[in-house]
Amino acid sequence: MTVKEKRRGRPKGENSQLNAQTILDTAKLMMREESKIPSIRKLATQLNIDAMAIYHYFDNKNALLEAITTSLIEDIYEPQVGTIENNWQQELTLLSKSYLTLLGTYPGLLETLLSMSSTSPAHVFSERFQLVLQPLNLKEDDIKNALDLLADYLHGYALALNCQSAEPALNIDSISGPLKLYCLALENC
């Protein structure tokens, strides 16, 4: 009987350079395939390294989780500064649809975001949202309330998209009407 020798530490060889970005990219790919954040052990197995090597780049599992989710959220639509003044409604729609697309691509992401204690991923969306609303010159409280309302709506909509049957009645484009009403309310704030 032979015993398989366990690989420890960082991978050896020119073709297998381990770094934080490689870990994040692999974790995001696994998350897309498995609909949940992969365990450290599964991630290490996929990377063909010992699990402890991941802790060289991330202090703990929560730091890795924050890095993964923040990296995913950073991929959503970034409002175009030059077009916000005249087309803030369109920019808000593009931001919202991009966020829903991300949540649909990574089905376990919504639950992960809502259960996290870190606010880094939410901060990314919040900054982009506030940039879109700059032309309205809203009060700080109104911006916070508008953000809370939109985030709750988008999270509920993403949940509905993930829970619908094989013949979908909802799609991402279906938010256009409700978003127009939302924008009208913001203009009259």
Residue ranges and their predicted role:
Residues 78-108, 150:
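Hydrophobic alpha-helical connector segments
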Residues 124-167, 186-189:
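Hydrophobic alpha-helical bundle segments that form small-molecule/ligand-binding pockets
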Residues 1-7, 163-189:
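C-terminal peripheral helix-coil segments that are non-catalytic and often amphipathic
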Residues 69, 97-127, 159-163:
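Amphipathic alpha-helical segments used for helix-helix packing
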Residues 70-77:
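Short, basic, alpha-helical segments at the C-terminal edge of helix-turn-helix-like DNA-binding modules
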Residues 23-31, 72, 99, 103:
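Short hydrophobic clusters on alpha-helical segments that form packing/core surfaces
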Residues 22, 26-63, 67:
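Helix-turn-helix
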